[in-house]
Each structure stands twice: as structure tokens, then as C-alpha cells.
Amino acid sequence: APPLGRHSTIVFGGTSTLHPPKCNWQPTRKYCCFLSHYKNEAGSDARDLRDLLQRMANAPVFLDSSDLADLKRLFTDGVQQSDVLVVLGTKGVLTRPWCLLELWEAHTQGVPIIFVTVEGRGFDFGDAKHFASHFTEELEVANPGALELVEKGLRQQGATVDDLAAALALLLDAA
């Protein structure tokens, strides 16, 4: 399993994003990172962060809306080809089937996972831990029908919702 437990908060704006510090990122895969996000809550933040990270690292960042034409290849061409999975923490990110499956894919493929809380978007680690500890019930209430999609995606990988819930709890406890 990948190293877990990295957490940060990001606020956009100001001069630091206009002229960010540079680093010499040496990617081991095609992308320095994969940005996992709930488009309705953090779509513009994800685009801004992608642009910022690409300038800082001088390396490509995977963002599904710009780098993928076929969602079936999201895992093989996205998550598996990224050095790190960055989850943009917003209120509903853990209720989205694709975001959950991206987390699972990263977990099973040994891709490190970092949570970045997007300020002002309602993410709370306490709420997220409660959600993970009552995963099946909470997911169905928060996003009716999502559980079925997640179960289907996990089944194709030989996994269960309980496996995902345990990995999610581990990730959130380490953050």
C-alpha cells in the first residue's frame, strides 16, 4: 500500500500563484500528479491548481477534463501513470463514484495519496472520518445510486465496498 497521510490546505490568489517557486521534479511516470476532484465543487480550483503545479514542477499534471477522452482509460492512462494522486477536499468529493474509484485505484497500485483541503468548500476531516466509518449508509444518503456504481467498479477489480471503506478510513486517519 502507498504511503498515506499527507494533508495540506490551498488558497488561490495573490502574487504567490502568479510567480510560484520552481522545483526540479523528476517524474517516474508520465504525470507528476493526478488531480481527483468533484467538478461541481472544485472544477475551477482543479484547473488553477493544474496550471500552478505544471509551472512549479515543469511536468505534466493529469486533470480528467483536459487529458482524457475515454473515461474507461481513466485508471490506466491517468492514475497508474501518475507519481501522486492529489484529492481536492470538498464537501462532496467522497460521495462521487469516480473520485472513490480513483482513490481505490491509487491505493491498490501503490500511488501515494495526498489530501488538499480547498478552503471554503466545506471539507471537514471529522465529517469525512464519520462518513468512512458508516460508508455504505452515508454514501447512499448523500448520493443515491452512487453505491451501486462504486460496487460495480470495485467488483470489476475483485474488491468490495468494505475494502474501499477500510482503505478510506486508513487514509483519513493518517491525514
Where are these regions (language model features)?
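Conserved N-terminal substructure of TIR/SEFIR domains
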Residues: 1-93, 97-126, 140-172
